[in-house]
Structures are given as structure tokens and as C-alpha cells.
A protein has these predicted regions:
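Non-ligating segments of multi-cofactor redox enzymes
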Residues: 1-512
Length: 512
């Protein structure tokens, strides 16, 4: 057994209001640069939809994640070494810019400089890639916001598998939920296995997956290999980039920017201890629907004296173990089993988990359209199909989703009877396997959600690091493996790049 620590995240979808504050703050901090205009390390999707980039969940098309072989081993779905080498100059599984969207800005200056005329001047869109005027904006990162497109397009959502999707196109049966997405910082990252240059690595001290900008050569196989499509190619620098989980903040014991600025208090950060020796065994599980339960077995009890002794022997600092004992992620994923992984069938063992959302139930239950099991509504009859949530979070296994939803409903029923009627309804807790202490703690974490409960992040022990971070302090900032310039003048073979036109200057001088 080899114990390692991982900073994990849980998002409570039952409280997400779809405000995009997380997306905007992340964008302003990390990707508001030339070459990354189209990239959103964090984005919020309205499900059901095909997402950003288009149909990212369709691995038959994009070849992301891992696939299990007949002999029980796993390989990246993109192919082995020979297939990657054969396609290294022309990757057939690479999303194009149209699959994301062509980033644009508007000619606001024209509103000030336009001559007098009969009609009011308008700010027309221009591409931030070519600088040319765009006649029509065709797509965007949240184009399907709040079910904004026709159902014929949204029914391509892969989570509709084994569901009669057409009936949910009717107004009376429609449903919606928000899904914030970011890099999963997987225990078994397919992007790292797909990179020909070996530029992607997973940090031992906190599990954050990063791209070494010195080693990256822009082959872009990692983009295809990542099933969540959370790696982006910077066309300015010629390098791939991804969510860095705000590791400078994590090292200082602070939450990520998206978690810090979340309006709905839906994000939780905490430490998980796991057995690194079992990753290959668990990722190779034969039945996809068993992957969720198998991944739970990897996580170790931070209060177990044997685990603590082994963790200290493996170099895990005592402060990290102390944080793991107070981790909200461990409580929600392992203790209470409320949080579930996003698409575990990709076999990457993701570490950003989600609490499934409850559907609007009060009026439906009162009208008799939702059945009741005692004081708890029947979760099989809720507005969001149970099968849809299972396809999204547990590879189609409905039992863990049903258990999580029942426990959320039981907590509400118990607290309602306690606050309104002044009685403790213990029967509703026994039916879902919870104790009074667990429910009171769930209420504190989910409903009250104090800052100190949501974020338990230990400061990094940089004295144990291989590199001297102090020597690079205040040096280059967020550069790209080419000194402090931010972009390289040479291509991957060392030859001088062709001159690039400055898009911002071009926008100012080009005429129609």
C-alpha cells in the first residue's frame, strides 16, 4: 500500500443557480490572454444539452478516456503508441475551433467614431482569432443556456441513452439542471498517458494534474485523450493548457478562485488519502457500473491508526492528515455517500464529484403527480429522470443516485418536522440508514455551508519540494516555457515561426 494525498472537490448541484460567477472569475484570472480567448477552464452547462465543446460526452466520436481490453488491461481509447505516432501530424479525433466556438469581440469604438447619420450606429462582432468581421455568431460556450436551443439538437445528449428522449421534448415534461465543469484532476488521467512528450504529470503532494510548458510540443493528443475535453490548445504560444486547480492558492491553504467566488456556496474542497497501488486494479474493473464502488475502496479512512502510520511513513505530512480528518469531501463522498463521480465509465477515476440535484417537488407532490413513500416523495417519479442522473454520475447504475436523493429528502423531512412540528421523526432517518448526528452534520455542511466547513485546505510543505520556488519568485509569472515573453518565436522543431498578425491592432485598422 502506497498512500498519497489528493485535493478533491465536491459540487452540490442541488444549490447551483447557474450564475456563471465561477466561470467569469476563472476566465479573468487564467485565460484572458491572446490564444486562449475560446478556452474556459470552468464553464457551466444547462443539461440536457450537447455541451462545450459540442458532444464532449460522445467518446465514440472523440475517443477520450480509457478502454478495457479482453485480457483485462486498459489502454487509452485514442489508441496505443503506434496509432498515436501514425496520427501525430494529423489527429483525426481533435475538436476544431467550430466545436468550441469562434471567440469574438465588438466594435464598441465605432459607437464613438461613427459619423452623423439617419440610423443609430451598432457595435458589430469581430473574430478574436482572424480579426475579420463576423456576419453571424453561430455558437458560444453557453449557447444552450437554460434550454436555449430546440430539443432536436439537445436530444443528442449522451445521457439520454436508454431513455425515451422524445417525451422530454414536450413542454409538460421538460426538465433542466446546471452542471459546472472543470478539470477532474483524475487519479488515472488519460491525458497524461496520451501525451507523446510526457509533458503532463500529477503532483504527489496534492494530486493536481499540470502540463509542463517546457516539455509541451503542441502535439494535442492530450486534447483527444481527455474525455472531459478540459485541455485547450493555445494557438499563440503553440502549447496546450488546462485548469491548474489554482495551485498557487492551494499551496497557501486557500480555495480555488471558482470555489472562493461561488455565490451559491456549492463547492467544497478537502483532502482525500488514497492507495496509489490500487489505481490500475480499480481502473481495470470489468463492469463499468462497479467503477464507482471500486473507487470508493481506494479512499482510506484518515482516522484509522494504521492508515495514519503508513501515511507518515510514505511522507504525507501530519498537517495533511489532520486536514483529511476534517475533509468535507470525504464526508460527502465516503461517509454520507451523497457525492458521485462524473462519468466514471471513462475509467480515469475523477476527483471532482457532484451531489445530484433534487427536482422541484412540492407542488408536484401536492397535485398528486409525484408519489409519496411516507413523508418522502418517490424519487423514481421526480421531474429529472433517475436514469438521466445515473447515466451522468454512475455509469447507468441507479441505486447510488437513488440512495443520495433519498438521503437529501430525508434530511429535509427530518429538519422540517424538527423545526415546524417540534418533533424528531427518527423513522425517516432509519429508512435511509442515517443517524441523528449525521443528519445534523449534513444540515450544517449543505444548508448553512460555512466557509471553514466548505474549505479545508492544508498549506503546502514546499520545503519537501524538488525545485526551489523562492528562486523563481516574482520572476516570469504565467509564462509558457519561453522565458518571460509569454510566447515563443520558434516552432516545435526550433525553426522561426511565421509572423503572426496582431489581432487587436488588426481589428482597429481593417475596413469592411
Amino acid at each position: 500500500m502506497k498512500i498519497r494525498s489528493q485535493i478533491g472537490m465536491v459540487l452540490n448541484l442541488d444549490k447551483c443557480i447557474g450564475c456563471h460567477t465561477c466561470s467569469i472569475t476563472c476566465k479573468n484570472v487564467w485565460t484572458s490572454r491572446e490564444g486562449m480567448e475560446y478556452a474556459w477552464f470552468n464553464n457551466v452547462e444547462s443539461k440536457p444539452d450537447i455541451g462545450y465543446p459540442k458532444e464532449w460526452e460522445n467518446q465514440d466520436k472523440w475517443k477520450g478516456g480509457w478502454v478495457r481490453n479482453a485480457n483485462g488491461s486498459i489502454n487509452p481509447r485514442i489508441g496505443g503508441k503506434f496509432r498515436v505516432l501514425a496520427n501525430i501530424f494529423a489527429n483525426p479525433d481533435l475538436p476544431s475551433l467550430d466545436d468550441y466556438y469562434e471567440p469574438f469581440d465588438f466594435d464598441y469604438q465605432h459607437l464613438h467614431t461613427a459619423p452623423l447619420g439617419e440610423h443609430q450606429p451598432t457595435a458589430r462582432p469581430r473574430s478574436l482569432v482572424s480579426g475579420k468581421r463576423m456576419q453571424k455568431i453561430e455558437w458560444g460556450p453557453n449557447w444552450e443556456e437554460i434550454l436555449g436551443t430546440e430539443f432536436a439538437k439537445r436530444r443528442k445528449d449522451k445521457n439520454f441513452d436508454q431513455i425515451q428522449a422524445d417525451i422530454y421534448g414536450e413542454y409538460e415534461n421538460t426538465f433542466m439542471m446546471y452542471l459546472p465543469r472543470l478539470c477532474e484532476h483524475c487519479l488515472n488521467p488519460a491525458c497524461a498517458a496520451s501525451c507523446p512528450s510526457g509533458a503532463i504529470y500529477k503532483r504527489e503532494e496534492d494530486g493536481i494534474v499540470l502540463i509542463d510548458q517546457e516539455k509541451c510540443r503542441g502535439w494535442r493528443m492530450c486534447i483527444s485523450g481527455c474525455p472531459y475535453k478540459k485541455i485547450y490548445f493555445n494557438w499563440k504560444s503553440g502549447k496546450s493548457e488546462k485548469c491548474i486547480f489554482c495551485y498557487p492558492r492551494i499551496e497557501a491553504g486557500m480555495p480555488t478562485v471558482c470555489a472562493e467566488t461561488c455565490v451559491g456556496r456549492i463547492r467544497y474542497l478537502g483532502v482525500l488519502l488514497y492507495d496509489a497501488d490500487r489505481i490500475s486494479e480499480v481502473a481495470s474493473t470489468a463492469n463499468e457500473q462497479d467503477l464507482y464502488e471500486k473507487q470508493l475502496e481506494i479512499f482510506l479512512d484518515p482516522n484509522d491508526p494504521a492508515v495514519i502510520r503508513q501515511a507518515l511513513a510514505d511522507g504525507v505530512p501530519q498537517s495533511v492528515i489532520d486536514s483529511a480528518q476534517r475533509s468535507p469531501v470525504y464526508k460527502m463522498a465516503v461517509d454520507w455517500k451523497l457525492a458521485l463521480p462524473l462519468h466514471p465509465e471513462y475509467r480515469t477515476l475523477p476527483m471532482v464529484w457532484y451531489v445530484p440535484p433534487l427536482s422541484p417537488i412540492q407542488n408536484a407532490a401536492a397535485a398528486g403527480t409525484v408519489g409519496m413513500n411516507g413523508v418522502i416523495p418517490d424519487v423514481d417519479s421526480l421531474r429529472i429522470p433517475l436514469r438521466y442522473l445515473a447515466n451522468l454520475l454512475t455509469a447507468g447504475d441507479e441505486k447510488p443516485v437513488k440512495r443520495a436523493l433519498k438521503r437529501l429528502l430525508a434530511m429535509r423531512a427530518y429538519k422540517r418536522s424538527q423545526q415546524v412540528d417540534g418533533v424528531q421523526d427518527l423513522q425517516v432517518l432509519e429508512d435511509v440508514g442515517l443517524s441523528v448526528e449525521q443528519v445534523e452534520e449534513m444540515y450544517r455542511y449543505l444548508a448553512i455551508a460555512n466557509y471553514e466547513d466548505r474549505f479545508v485546505v492544508p498549506s503546502a510543505h514546499r520545503e519537501d519540494a524538488m525545485s526551489d520556488a523562492f528562486a523563481e519568485r516574482s520572476g516570469c509569472g504565467f509564462s509558457f516555457g519561453s522565458g518571460c515573453s509569454g510566447s515563443s518565436d520558434t516552432n516545435m522543431f526550433g525553426a522561426k515561426k511565421a509572423n503572426r498578425r496582431d489581432v487587436l491592432k488588426t481589428v482597429q485598422i481593417w475596413e469592411d
